[in-house]
């Protein structure tokens, strides 16, 4: 008999999962987690520094560690505390380099089968030969339809899993120092109190030990922003290394990074002196005259997807993937640069080009999203453009899980203390939640307007203040001007002392024009939250809505939504979707006063940048629908090429880029612009064949798949031709 319980965090990449397994000759009735295990396995070496991995292990127990290092270096890298426990409890200690084995046999970073085999080799719950036979039988069943090559690779994983190495546990380890002094741990004095006392404890899976008193002052559920920067999980086996001699300074690597772990920095001579000896090159552009340029990677925040390397357009790649071990010094460079070098967004127009946009600080960083996530680059760029004044209502789904799961908060603030204010609502009412935020903000800004009008006649307010009041009243909806008024006016409010200035100071956060955003996936926007979304855009309120379209319910495991196209396999559509994809964007255009756009950052990042600029500037509801390649698609070329997959989707006509701008109609122009080129329809079938969600249907039901795939292509052509007709209309007739 066997029993299994699982505890896990919400990270979608490199997340913590603890499997509690029991085996016995009799029925097991233990409705609680294992607290005193006989066997412990740690599949990620870095977890040894993050969690109490050996907690509760029984004397004479067994410990298996997946280590990328030699036996000698493995021992050297273990903390004294771990070695002391191994010695005191006489633990049998084994290692295996499952990471290297997986790479060698073609499984990439998939180590689970190797480590499962290693478990059966040393745990001896059943004879190892029997376990090997059973595992290979399960492989045939699970992967048989995916081809002989996949089966052979997993067979090899099982065979290689038996190659464990036993490490001698020395008696002198029991005398190791565990005092917690500097010889045992890195200096933590620079970590904020909230991080040390709450975030670190929860991330170490010890959150249940926190008393209620630890949350004093946070009774309303508000948490500080930017906590993800302190995690430094180090989950990637390989990370990008920058080669300055090949770099053309396009900043595309920074644009596509799902986790904001690679960024361009421009150094003044003073800043260069502060950071010491690092490799830089002359910065391009007259704005950066006399300055130096560098692309910096944060290896401990990178998930190792490789999209940055894939999009690098240099003839000889300026980035290559290297082992994490070889890039550990870059972690110090990252910390040094981010502390001493400013972002140069004030020297360029960040909305002018993709390159310029990346000189702005991302205010969404180091989330728990999947490696290679196709969603997060969209959000990250929005925060770079508007993050200082953003308010976000986030629907439940992938974007809320990686966007704000306690205690990890990837939305952060800049050196001025400004950044997005973020909140998560229910699946079904997020649009209304965002509308409520926008309405409340508008009402508060109406109060600011009333106060400033009264201030113009106030005898207490100075002439300088009155000039600022008038400037604000003339430019209430201008972000740049209202920010200038804020910076000049707020320091003077406490000096005046009149009731008007006191009330203005109490509500100063509403002086600057806010950028209200509503985020969610296609399961929310097309399905469950569609009624609310329709209500919000019909209201005419000045809100910006981003629907991240993965064409399935990604967070809950890939169920079909109304965004799922014909022929795609998804849960609840196991034999292929039979109904064509809902055209949410076209539905929204029927109102006539809603800004609508369909984008793919992998296909045309400049178009997406233009859409963001237009949507934010439009005084009314804006809806942006973004194509996001997802792990649920089963992309054959891998999640390291999600940007390439988005590009291919547009090239073959699977996805189309367009904008509907009501402002153009007011000028007598056609509001509809078709931004993508004529598709190469000959590539359509090859594109869908490159994703398991389509390809697996062909293997299971070849004749039915052929009919559905043909219908999918015809639907795409029909949709494209309808867009073409709209784009060619003479709006004056």
Segments (PLM) and residue ranges:
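Ferredoxin-type iron-sulfur electron-transfer modules and their immediate structural context
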Residues: 131, 135, 144-301, 309-517, ...
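A structural-propensity feature for long, helix-poor, extended segments
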Residues: 6-44, 48, 148, 158, ...
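Glycine-rich ThDP/TPP pyrophosphate-binding loop and its adjacent helix/strand module
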Residues: 496-498, 512-520, 527-543, 548-678
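Active-site cofactor/cluster-binding pocket
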Residues: 1-202, 272-277, 566-571, 628-666
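Alpha-helix capping and helix-loop boundary segments enriched in small/acidic/polar residues
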Residues: 28-31, 35, 102-106, 126, ...
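Short acidic, glycine/serine/threonine-rich loops at helix termini
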Residues: 14-17, 52-53, 74-78, 105-108, ...
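Thiamine diphosphate
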Residues: 1-59, 368, 374-391, 400-413, ...
């Amino acid at each position: 008999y066997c029993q299994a319980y699982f505890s896990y965090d919400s990270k979608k990449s490199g997340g913590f999962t603890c499997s509690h397994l029991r085996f016995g000759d009799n029925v097991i009735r233990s409705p609680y987690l294992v607290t005193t295990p006989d066997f412990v396995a740690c599949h990620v070496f870095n977890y040894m520094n993050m969690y109490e991995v050996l907690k509760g292990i029984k004397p004479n127990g067994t410990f298996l560690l997946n280590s990328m290092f030699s036996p000698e270096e493995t021992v050297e890298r273990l903390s004294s505390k771990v070695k002391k426990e191994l010695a005191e409890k006489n633990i049998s200690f084994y290692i295996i380099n499952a990471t290297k084995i997986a790479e060698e046999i073609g499984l990439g970073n998939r180590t689970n089968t190797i480590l499962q085999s290693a478990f059966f080799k040393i745990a001896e719950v059943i004879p190892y030969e029997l376990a090997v036979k059973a595992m290979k039988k399960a492989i045939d069943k699970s992967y048989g339809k995916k081809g002989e090559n996949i089966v052979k690779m997993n067979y090899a994983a099982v065979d290689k899993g038996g190659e464990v190495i036993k490490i001698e546990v020395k008696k002198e380890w029991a005398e190791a120092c565990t005092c917690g002094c500097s010889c045992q741990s890195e200096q933590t004095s620079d970590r904020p109190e909230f991080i040390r006392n709450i975030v670190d404890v929860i991330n170490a899976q010890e959150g249940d030990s926190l008393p209620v008193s630890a949350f004093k002052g946070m009774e309303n559920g508000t948490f500080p922003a930017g906590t993800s920067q302190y995690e430094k999980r180090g989950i990637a086996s390989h990370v990008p290394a920058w080669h300055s001699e090949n770099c053309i300074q396009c900043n595309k690597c920074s644009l596509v990074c799902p986790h904001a772990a690679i960024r361009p920095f421009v150094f003044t001579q003073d800043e260069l002196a502060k950071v010491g000896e690092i490799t830089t090159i002359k910065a391009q552009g007259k704005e950066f005259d006399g300055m130096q340029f560098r692309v910096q990677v944060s290896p401990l925040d990178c998930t190792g997807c490789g999209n940055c390397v894939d999009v690098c357009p240099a003839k000889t790649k300026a980035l290559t993937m290297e082992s994490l071990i070889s890039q550990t010094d870059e972690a110090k460079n990252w910390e040094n640069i981010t502390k001493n070098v400013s972002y140069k967004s004030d020297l360029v127009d960040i909305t002018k080009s993709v390159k310029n946009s990346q000189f702005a600080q991302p205010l969404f960083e180091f989330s728990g999203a999947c490696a290679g996530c196709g969603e997060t680059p969209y959000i990250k760029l929005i925060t770079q453009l508007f993050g200082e004044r953003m308010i976000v209502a986030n629907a439940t789904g992938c974007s809320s899980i990686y966007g704000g799961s306690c205690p990890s908060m990837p939305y952060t603030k800049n050196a001025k203390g400004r950044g997005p204010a973020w909140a998560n609502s229910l699946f079904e009412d997020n649009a209304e939640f965002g509308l409520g935020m926008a309405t409340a903000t508008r009402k508060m800004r109406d109060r600011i307007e009333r106060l400033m009008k009264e201030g113009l006649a106030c005898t207490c307010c100075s002439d300088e203040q009155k000039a600022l009041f008038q400037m604000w009243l003339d430019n209430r909806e201008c972000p740049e001007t209202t920010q200038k008024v804020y910076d000049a006016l707020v320091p003077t409010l406490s000096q005046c002392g009149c009731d008007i200035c006191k009330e203005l100071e109490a509500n100063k956060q509403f002086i600057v024009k806010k950028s209200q955003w509503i985020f969610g996936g296609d399961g929310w926007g097309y399905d469950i939250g569609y009624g609310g979304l329709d209500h919000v855009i019909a209201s005419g309120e000045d809100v910006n809505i981003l629907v991240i379209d993965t064409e399935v319910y990604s967070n809950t495991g890939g169920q079909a939504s109304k965004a799922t196209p014909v022929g795609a396999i998804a849960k609840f559509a196991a034999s292929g979707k039979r109904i064509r994809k809902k055209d949410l964007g076209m539905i929204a255009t029927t109102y006539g006063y809603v800004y609508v756009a369909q984008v793919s950052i992998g296909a045309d990042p400049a178009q997406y940048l233009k859409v963001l600029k237009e949507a934010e500037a439009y005084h009314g509801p804006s809806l942006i629908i973004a194509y996001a390649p997802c792990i649920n698609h089963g992309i054959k070329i891998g999640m390291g090429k999600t940007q390439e997959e988005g590009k291919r989707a547009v090239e073959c006509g699977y996805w189309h880029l367009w904008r509907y701008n009501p402002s153009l109609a007011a000028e007598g122009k056609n509001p509809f612009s078709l931004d993508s080129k004529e598709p190469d329809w000959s590539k359509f079938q090859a594109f869908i064949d490159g994703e398991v969600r389509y390809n697996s249907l062909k293997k299971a039901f070849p004749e039915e798949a052929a009919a559905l795939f043909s219908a999918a292509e015809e639907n795409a052509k029909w949709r494209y031709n309808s867009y073409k007709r709209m784009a060619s209309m003479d709006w004056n007739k």
